[in-house]
Amino acid sequence: MKITTVGVCIISGIFPLLILPQLPGTLTLAFLTLFACVLAFIPVKTVRYIALTLLFFVWGILSAKQILWAGETLTGATQDAIVEITATDGMTTHYGQITHLQGRRIFPASGLVMYGEYLPQAVCAGQQWSMKLKVRAVHGQLNDGGFDSQRYAIAQHQPLTGRFLQASVIEPNCSLRAQYLASLQTTLQPYPWNAVILGLGMGERLSVPKEIKNIMRDTGTAHLMAISGLHIAFAALLAAGLIRSGQIFLPGRWIHWQIPLIGGICCAAFYAWLTGMQPPALRTMVALATWGMLKLSGRQWSGWDVWICCLAAILLMDPVAILSQSLWLSAAAVAALIFWYQWFPCPEWQLPPVLRAVVSLIHLQLGITLLLMPVQIVIFHGISLTSFIANLLAIPLVTFITVPLILAAMVVHLSGPLILEQGLWFLADRSLALLFWGLKSLPEGWINIAECWQWLSFSPWFLLVVWRLNAWRTLPAMCVAGGLLMCWPLWQKPRPDEWQLYMLDVGQGLAMVIARNGKAILYDTGLAWPEGDSGQQLIIPWLHWHNLEPEGVILSHEHLDHRGGLDSILHIWPMLWIRSPLNWEHHQPCVRGEAWQWQGLRFSAHWPLQGSNDKGNNHSCVVKVDDGTNSILLTGDIEAPAEQKMLSRYWQQVQATLLQVPHHGSNTSSSLPLIQRVNGKVALASASRYNAWRLPSNKVKHRYQLQGYQWIDTPHQGQTTVNFSAQGWRISSLREQILPRWYHQWFGVPVDNG
């Protein structure tokens, strides 16, 4: 059996982890294992391939279950554990691994992230601490087109978050890497670009300023900050070159071609360890070791053979890496380059060496820019228009000047002399100053791409195949049909009789979108925190991804968990009208008696009263949206006293099909009279799973259910979509109907919401 065939079986067996709605049970896995063993004895190649694929499928499922074990069993109760610190910001965020539990060693260790508290003494990577832990299973917000933090955490082997109740250090010594890093940080303090140097050399990206990260994102050069293929492969190449040069001085019988290869891989492994062996670096080392073994075999391997074997080795070692977007981006980039150089090789023009190198670089960057576009849009929901020019400058500068200088300085830092080390750091710092001067000179190039353009992004692949096969002459009808299929989503227009309500999963806040005919109105804008807000992080990218143009905002009240994203949204769309009960400048009133039409929908305000001096929750703007058949009642954070006053007159006007649960499902709201007078079918609650107030309240939830409401909340369902049409209405949630995946489930204690 060929090794590439085994690689295909590995990839095929583990790939279902990406799409399974839930993991099979133990009995199912036992049956599949037994069935695969039976198939293996059938002397038919295809059947044996199927058996091997089934065994790798079982291996992938067992690996996923192993990661989820911690989240399913360690939550709820207090745990006595020994934690080895793997990374820290030196303040309140600590990454670690639980190596011992209740006095017993566990293998493999479970990843843990602790937030919000200082440890009793100075902390560094490599220390071991005895802790009394209160841990929680990872749970992330889930929105269509948003960052999937739950999937990311599982791919990073970090299924737990939590805090420590008690902590005492067992092993106070820092790891050799941490000591080396601390020494580098002290040495690099005088240099302006020290944070970027540490990011490039040691993979320490926590200290890189947000401004620099934004520049690299906008110019498509953020990939240079990851300690991955570029840095580690260059370290291997440099070490192999030095070893090969040293062989000149050895007797002929001691010279073997394998020695530089093995030495380069060993040096690359040491460098990967020195940088913290982060997942991209670990995957690169597995791929590099696989390539080395293929090279040592003495056979000729094609680019696709190596690609399959490397990807299979990575997935065999770490099956849940299939969830990692960075792995998919790297694998797609390599596949795109193999395809590019096979189907469109660089022209062999007779040019001087320097110009030939420039043409080769332009050819490479053109291929990666065009062919990687579909993956970039799927993962990042946008592209950088300046990435082509930016990478023409950044890749050669960083690859051939900055990184070699940093690697050399890191070596000299251990051996001296000091003056040589200072010179190397200075040159590396100045090369970065030149790089970012060039990047800052470029215009802001990042543009968000709507989902409807996704298929059209495959056009470079399609056109390249059509051109190379001369299909535009031999198969013109097929070429036209392919082009039309890629453009089809752009021609689809919203049905005029349909409109949608989206309840976004913004955590402990509220953000709802009413959409019709490509236009949108926001009811509240989520929350804000010191480093950002829901508008910038979620709502703006979400609107772009769904190709919706907002025309107005309704603010229920002034609390920050409801208006947190407003400033960011107004920065992008400054002409939006705003309605609120706040009497702020440029705000239109939202008080009882106000009514208006928008896209054929009738909006009517039912609270607060005109001239009311109330503030806070009971001053929330309550709005009813009606299409003549179905309606929704948006209530903000209104509480029971205001509910009673609102219902004292005109209570028939608040009847609605759907009700947004007031105040995130708090006991202070959702009085029985309100629930009965609205007489709705569905209750929609927005909250975070781990909130300090344990909302939504189980009493409130049962109160709605006893009155015949279907209960839906964002912790369980994620983003929820209600589609209204002439035929009625239909609800779908991202976590359960639209994108059901095993890694999106509610892990840990079933009733835990605090």
Swiss-Prot record:
Organism: Escherichia coli (strain K12)
Ranges that cross the membrane: 3-23, 24-44, 50-70, 223-243, 254-274, 320-340, 370-390, 392-412, 446-466, 471-491
Key word Glycoprotein present: no
Gene3D superfamilies from the UniProt entry: Ribonuclease Z/Hydroxyacylglutathione hydrolase-like
Pfam families: Competence (PF03772), Lactamase_B (PF00753)
PANTHER family, alphabetized: DNA INTERNALIZATION/COMPETENCE PROTEIN COMEC/REC2 (PTHR30619), RECOMBINATION PROTEIN 2 (PTHR30619:SF1)
GO cellular component term of the entry, any: plasma membrane
Protein name in the entry: Uncharacterized protein YcaI
Keywords of this entry: Cell membrane, Membrane, Transmembrane, Transmembrane helix
S-S pairs: none
Localization: Cell membrane
CDD domains: ComA-like_MBL-fold (cd07731)
Protein family per UniProt: To B.subtilis ComEC, N.gonorrhoeae ComA, and H.influenzae Rec2.
InterPro entries reported in the protein's UniProt record: ComA-like_MBL, ComEC_N, Competence_ComEC/Rec2, Competence_DNA_uptake, Metallo-B-lactamas, RibonucZ/Hydroxyglut_hydro
Lineage: Bacteria, Pseudomonadati, Pseudomonadota, Gammaproteobacteria, Enterobacterales
Record GO biological process: establishment of competence for transformation
Membrane association type: Multi-pass membrane protein
